Amino acid sequence: DDLFNINAGIVKLFGVTTLDVVR
């Protein structure tokens, strides 16, 4: 989903991809 991709990009800015962990 686009929302998940956008959130993933925002999280990556923090240096941690929590969404990737959830997936």
UniProtKB/Swiss-Prot annotation:
Belongs to the LDH/MDH superfamily. MDH type 1 family. The keyword Ribonucleoprotein does not apply. It catalyses: (S)-malate + NAD(+) = oxaloacetate + NADH + H(+). Keywords: NAD, Oxidoreductase, Tricarboxylic acid cycle. Homodimer. GO terms for molecular function: L-malate dehydrogenase (NAD+) activity. NAD(+) binds at residue 7. Substrate binds at residue 23. This is Malate dehydrogenase. It is an enzyme of class 1 (oxidoreductase). Its EC number is 1.1.1.37. The keyword Cytoplasm does not apply. GO terms for biological process: tricarboxylic acid cycle. It comes from the Eukaryota.
